[in-house]
């Protein structure tokens, strides 16, 4: 079962940190682009090669530290078929090193179409879990739920996202007295009862933004069986203290994603004096170690205060 594998990897690595592989060609080190363009030319094939080589360097640097990577498909789709090849190659390489692979695809459509999305990703052995948009209702999620159970995969359903304007829709008050995001949470919590692993968590998880710690506390109570995928740490402004409400009392229940903050750490003010572009992987590794320490310390502090 996906969620059991995830929890066991989190325990083994002693970190909830997930690295997002969102390569932007303009931010990839020049030496990688030069090599990729030498091999494949400076068109889309060369760009896709540069993205893959960059990702491979990040994975090599952090795979022993983290339980999973999250690959955002949009950064690859932008380059057509060649971009998709880089997307799948990245997933394959991460899997070869024992990492859990989350495809951040945010799919959502009517049930008949959702079957095809689910076939494309949840029935693909390269991917362990995907992100899903629930806006079209419960029946649109049925194909994903069926494949989660049949193939031992997972989904993370968008509930309260990290972007600033998420409140425009997700915080609309309902006739029942709560907010839209709470109604989605209730639906996900109900669905999560069907597929529960040996640690008490479900393979039906939720996306809950680190930039909304107050709402995260509410949602942790609303969805006690749901593992949270938490974006918004680092580049979007959330801190270790902001994410603690996503965790249960034992320090589990959430994985915290950082994309730009890790993969472009070598360009940050904090690390750029210590690491050159040739050492981008080492900078990423140090950022993961720092992030892990900060989150774990924040969790210890919360537990101490609570006691």
Curated annotation (Swiss-Prot):
ATP-binding listed as a keyword: no
Pathway membership: Pyrimidine metabolism; UMP biosynthesis via de novo pathway; UMP from orotate: step 2/2
GO biological process, one term: 'de novo' pyrimidine nucleobase biosynthetic process
Gene Ontology molecular function terms on file: orotidine-5'-phosphate decarboxylase activity
Top enzyme category: lyase
Catalytic activity: orotidine 5'-phosphate + H(+) = UMP + CO2
Residues forming the catalytic site: 106
Keywords: Decarboxylase, Lyase, Pyrimidine biosynthesis
InterPro entries: Aldolase_TIM, OMPdecase_type-2, OMPdeCOase_dom, RibuloseP-bd_barrel
Gene3D superfamilies noted in UniProt: Aldolase class I
The protein's Enzyme Commission number: 4.1.1.23
Source species, domain of life: Bacteria
Entry keyword Lyase: yes
CDD domains the UniProt entry points to: OMP_decarboxylase_like
Matches recorded under SMART domains: OMPdecase (SM00934)
One family name in Pfam for this protein: OMPdecase
HAMAP family tied to this protein: OMPdecase_type2
Annotated family: Belongs to the OMP decarboxylase family. Type 2 subfamily.
Classification via PANTHER family: OROTIDINE 5'-PHOSPHATE DECARBOXYLASE
Protein name: Orotidine 5'-phosphate decarboxylase
Species for this entry: Caldanaerobacter subterraneus subsp. tengcongensis (strain DSM 15242 / JCM 11007 / NBRC 100824 / MB4)
Upper taxonomic lineage: Bacteria, Bacillati, Bacillota, Clostridia, Thermoanaerobacterales
